């Protein structure tokens, strides 16, 4: 039994007073409900019809239980449980905690006015009336607190469920689930699909702090392998997003239609594997293309650069670097020399060696093959 209920049982109202108060319970419940309708906007249209009847019965039951306590005739049961469930139900009906507490305040005032109107004519002494008032408000306060707890618990449970649905959707997006599956998951999570999603990889510890600064519809996971987090940012302004990620160890994938977010994620993962310095995958497309099939790239290099294998390792490395700069600078000797930090004559000498090793160096096919083969620095 609650503290207020124990104190109420100490009142020991006489049978005459209790009978008078019970006779007014229906009228009291009607007036309480009407006052709530009139004074609390959230309930203006909620307490009519069958719902209104349910609430009136609940008010009569709660006050009747209180009168049982006050007369010393309580037979068990606890109004707190019903009040707790009422609070949970208010969340399901879409009403706020403020609306619920306002309804209790209005209800307490009107209920006491009606109870006092019955107690005083029944001959309850003034001192007992004062105590009755105090305990009535204390009892209703406890019911209010129980409803508030139910409301808060239901909100928390719904919040956790909502978060689980969003996390499930994010995992399905990363896994490349079918559009039908993704649409169903999005609806279950109450998530409005955008046109595009951009994947952002970053350390798990940074995922939530960054997430809080982004579009509220951003999806976040912070429990991926290797202490990695991922954000799926809807319809991102790329330049703005990159500025927001300044000083973060983030890798930003390309924007992709939202059902293909897995492609953005996969590219970000591959880009991060290339180098820890990668930030914007759009700045590293050549490297990503050349590294897409590692075996094919290794075979291409082995075939295209086979003539260099006859040379000492250091010599082969210098000539490969010279060949790379020569291809990239389209044979402009001074630019090649500047890129290599050598004299132009050194470039001339090395190119003579390369032409001897690659007699068909001017062939378009050979130029294409060699450009691809030396395209990744340090391969």
Residue ranges and their predicted role:
Residues 179-199, 206-379:
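Cytosolic nucleotide-utilizing catalytic cores of signal-transduction proteins
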Residues 1-167, 218, 322-379:
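Alpha-helical/coil-rich non-catalytic "connector" segments in signaling and regulatory proteins
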Residues 164-168, 178, 190:
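Canonical alpha-helical transmembrane segment with a positive-inside/aromatic-interface signature
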Residues 102, 174, 294-295:
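Short capping/connector residues at structural and topological boundaries
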Residues 169-173:
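Regulatory cytosolic signal-relay segments
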